[in-house]
């Protein structure tokens, strides 16, 4: 019995049976079992065994095994009789040979797989190295661009500070100039009156004595000499100005912008010093003139008194001389009286000589006063010359300031151009953030405690901080507008993007945010007030104005307009003539109107809406009336958060087809302007009934939009565009080759901080999405004239 057990063929292990059965599907196990009894197992190996007992390694490499053959080989058993030990041994030997061949084949296959794995690993390493090198180069270029932008912003800030300082100094200089001008006018008037009085004195002196005439002649000669000196001084000043201008030009050619700013500071300081000194000298000159005027008046009064005394003495002398003659002729006069008269006559003559000396002294004092007056005139001339120099210096500073402002403007344009180029190369969705002002119904003036704007160079005009529960949440976008930004400032930033539609690009601009955050005001504004027009009317005005200017270059444009709204996941035509304006019918389900609108996308990426009203437009007035019609038909309602809350998504589309007759070139652009309905919480809006249904539909579509953005950000293979009508309509804008910009509107109300944070986080994800590089639609043939949203 033991010998019988030893000669018996070994039974297969139960584990081997389980593994073999587990690798075969349950429904095919019976078929596999039946098939093994009707076919020759491992026919390839059997044919090889018939030719030779042991195959070489090279021959084994040519043999291939299938999975079924390997399983059959593992399940093969000896078929000899129960006591035929030799037959069993031969059969087991054959099975072992077959297994060796199979094992060798598996070894070769495994070696091949290892070699392929090594090759793939080396290829992967080289690809990763190339990718890391490219990524390093891209980061280096990005850092260089950021450094350039940072440097430009620093220069802009410093130049703006210098500009404000120069403006203040300019205003001070203008005020000082006005005061000096008034003082100069008063001084000139006093000088004219003084000269008139002096002329009168000269005339009286000419009548009184020839010596005064000679003094006046000498004074005239001195005046002529003074005039020649002034002319020579003016010539010297002109030469000095020419030399200074040449020196200034040389400095401008050699110095950089920083040196120019330093020079501006020095000139400003010296100008202030010169103005102060000129002001002091002007005051001294005025005081000297006043003192001289008083001295001249005193001299004139004394001179008049001396003249009166002299005339009186002359009259007395003549009278005495007549009396002497009369006394000489008179016989009854005594010689004693004659001596007395002679003595009186001598005393009168002595008094007259004293009066002459007094007149001479007064004349000398008058000449001294005239000399002082000439010195004052020279001082005034010198002051005027210095004032002209300072005025010239002010003009030079103004020219430099204008040149600096021009350089700042050119630098800002270059920065914007580089920024737009980077965004287009990246293919990202641009995001602008706008904060609306506080309203009387908001929770007090607490914006400063909720919203903050960073002042650093990198984040200036692009960053915004939201504070919630003491935690600051920073965000950075392509542009941030504070509550004081006007509609014109906002449109200026997107004007070039709107212009791209005329150049043949697809452009999409949409506003996102919670209800009551200012989306409709941003997009539509108040068209009846020019300063408060929104992006839609301003964009249309620019497009029509630019198209008219391009007509001189041979361009002719055809424009088509359509407007629709997505209300409760249904499309409504806002320009349909059969549409009822009544609010109740507007709120009715679109299924009851008998018209269904479907969205389709063609192979060119264009989106079409069936049965949608398309209107050809040729003027801004025509579009304004269409906008008014659409505004009356749009679904709006009152909630606790907003008096006129938009209850639907509004889509305005302008299709532009342009043809150049001279070059036969055609461009086709599309401008989509979208006002999304705002997200809202039921606890705050208090929506019930129809309002509740509207709120649920709005939140559902915005949630679908969020899912699409998340899928794009993660670069998933499947993007759920079909989950809502809104995302399916925006598919070419979010996943195509269009230029797309999103406005995220937030409220500064402290009670809306949570919603504002959600909106900003969503906007940050949108800004990180890559949708592809924009592609211009241009051709030499006329394209299909159907309206496209894409």
Swiss-Prot record:
Slightly expressed in anther lobes with pollen mother cells at anther stage 5. Strongly expressed at anther stage 6 in the tapetum and meiotic cells. Also detected in the gynoecium and the ovule. Belongs to the TRAFAC class myosin-kinesin ATPase superfamily. Kinesin family. KIN-14 subfamily. PANTHER family: KINESIN-LIKE PROTEIN KLP-3 (PTHR47972), PROTEIN CLARET SEGREGATIONAL (PTHR47972:SF45). Residues 117-316, 347-426 form a coiled coil. The lineage of its organism: Eukaryota, Viridiplantae, Streptophyta, Embryophyta, Tracheophyta. Kinesin that supports microtubule movement in an ATP-dependent manner and that functions as a minus-end directed motor as well as a plus-end tracking protein. During mitosis, is involved in early spindle assembly. Participates in the capture of antiparallel interpolar microtubules and helps in generating force to coalign microtubules. SUPFAM superfamilies: P-loop containing nucleoside triphosphate hydrolases (SSF52540), Tropomyosin (SSF57997). ATP binds at residues 513-520. Composed of three structural domains; a small globular N-terminal, a central alpha-helical coiled coil and a large globular C-terminal which is responsible for the motor activity (it hydrolyzes ATP and binds microtubules). Residues 34-55 have a biased composition (Polar residues). Pfam families: Kinesin. Residues 1-66 are annotated as: Globular. Residues 1-56, 116-139 are annotated as: Disordered. Residues 16-33, 127-139 have a biased composition (Basic and acidic residues). It is found in: Cytoplasm, Cytoskeleton; Cytoplasm, Cytoskeleton, Phragmoplast. It comes from Arabidopsis thaliana. Residues 428-769 form the Kinesin motor domain. This is Kinesin-like protein KIN-14D. By measuring the velocity of microtubule translocation, the speed of ATK5 was determined to be 6.30 um/min at 20 degrees Celsius.
């Amino acid at each position: 019995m033991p010998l019988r057990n030893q000669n018996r063929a070994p039974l297969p292990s139960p584990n081997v049976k389980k593994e073999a059965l587990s690798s075969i599907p349950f429904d095919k196990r019976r078929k596999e079992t039946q098939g093994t009894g009707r076919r020759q197992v491992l026919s390839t190996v059997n044919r090889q065994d018939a030719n030779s007992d042991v195959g070489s390694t090279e021959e084994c490499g040519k043999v291939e095994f299938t999975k079924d053959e390997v399983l059959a080989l593992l399940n093969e058993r000896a078929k000899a009789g129960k006591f035929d030990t030799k037959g069993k041994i031969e059969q087991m030997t054959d099975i072992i040979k077959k297994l060796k061949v199979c094992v060798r084949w598996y070894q070769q296959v495994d070696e091949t797989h290892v070699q392929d794995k090594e090759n793939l690993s080396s290829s992967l390493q080289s690809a990763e190295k190339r990718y890391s090198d490219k990524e390093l180069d891209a980061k280096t270029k990005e850092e260089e661009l950021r450094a350039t932008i940072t440097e430009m912003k620093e220069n802009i800030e410093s130049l703006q500070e210098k500009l404000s300082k120069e403006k203040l100094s300019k205003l001070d200089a203008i005020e000082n100039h006005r005061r000096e001008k008034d003082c100069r006018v008063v001084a000139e008037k006093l000088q004219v009156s003084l000269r008139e009085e002096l002329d009168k004195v000269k005339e009286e002196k000419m009548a009184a004595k020839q010596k005064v005439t000679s003094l006046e002649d000498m004074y005239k000669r001195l005046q002529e000499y003074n005039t020649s000196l002034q002319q020579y001084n003016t010539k010297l000043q002109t030469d000095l100005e020419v030399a200074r201008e040449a020196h200034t030009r040389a400095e401008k050619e050699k110095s950089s912008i920083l040196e120019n700013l330093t020079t501006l500071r020095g000139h400003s300081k010296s100008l202030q010093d010169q103005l102060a000194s000129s002001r002091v000298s002007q005051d001294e000159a005025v005081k000297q003139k006043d003192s001289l005027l008083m001295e001249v008046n005193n001299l004139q009064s004394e001179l008049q008194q001396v003249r009166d005394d002299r005339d009186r003495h002359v009259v007395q002398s003549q009278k005495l001389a007549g009396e002497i003659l009369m006394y000489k002729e008179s016989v009854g006069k005594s010689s004693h009286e004659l001596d007395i008269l002679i003595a009186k006559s001598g005393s009168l003559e002595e008094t007259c000589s004293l009066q002459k000396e007094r007149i001479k002294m007064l004349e000398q004092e008058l000449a001294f006063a005239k000399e002082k007056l000439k010195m004052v005139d020279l001082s005034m001339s010198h002051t005027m010359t210095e004032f002209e120099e300072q005025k010239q210096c002010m003009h030079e500073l103004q020219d430099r300031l204008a040149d600096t402002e021009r350089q700042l403007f050119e630098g800002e344009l270059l920065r914007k151009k580089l920024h737009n180029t980077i965004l287009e190369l990246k293919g990202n969705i641009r995001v602008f953030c706008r904060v609306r002002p506080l309203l009387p119904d908001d929770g007090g003036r607490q914006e400063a405690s909720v919203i903050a704007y960073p002042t650093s160079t990198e984040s200036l005009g692009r960053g915004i901080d939201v504070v919630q529960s003491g935690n600051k949440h920073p965000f950075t976008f392509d542009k941030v507008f504070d509550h004081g930004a006007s509609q014109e400032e906002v449109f200026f930033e997107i004007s070039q993007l709107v212009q791209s539609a005329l150049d043949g690009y697809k452009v999409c601009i949409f506003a996102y945010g919670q209800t009551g955050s200012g989306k409709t005001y941003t997009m539509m504004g108040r068209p009846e007030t020019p300063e408060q027009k929104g992006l839609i009317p301003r964009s249309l005005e620019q497009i029509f104005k630019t198209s008219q200017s391009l007509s001189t270059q041979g361009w002719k444009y055809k424009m088509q307009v359509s407007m629709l709204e997505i209300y409760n996941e249904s499309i409504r035509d806002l320009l349909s003539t059969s549409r009822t304006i009544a609010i109740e019918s507007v709120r009715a389900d679109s299924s009851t109107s008998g018209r269904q609108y479907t969205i389709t996308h063609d192979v060119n990426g264009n989106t079409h809406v069936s049965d949608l009203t398309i209107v050809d437009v040729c003027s801004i007035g025509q579009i304004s009336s269409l906008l008014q019609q659409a505004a009356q038909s749009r679904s709006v309602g009152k909630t606790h958060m907003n008096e006129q809350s938009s209850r639907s998504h509004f889509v305005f589309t302008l299709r532009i087809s342009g043809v150049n007759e001279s070059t036969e070139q055609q461009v086709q652009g599309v401008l989509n302007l979208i006002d999304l309905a705002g997200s809202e919480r039921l606890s705050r809006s208090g929506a019930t009934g129809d309002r509740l249904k509207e709120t649920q539909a709005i939140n559902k579509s915005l949630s679908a939009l969020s899912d699409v953005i998340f899928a794009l950000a993660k670069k998933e293979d499947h993007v759920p565009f079909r989950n809502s009508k809104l995302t399916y309509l925006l598919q070419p804008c979010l996943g195509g080759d269009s230029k797309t910009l999103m406005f995220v509107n937030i409220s500064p109300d402290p009670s809306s901080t949570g919603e504002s944070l959600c909106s900003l986080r969503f906007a940050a994800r949108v800004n990180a999405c890559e949708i592809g590089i924009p592609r211009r639609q241009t051709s030499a043939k006329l394209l299909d004239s159907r309206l496209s949203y894409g």
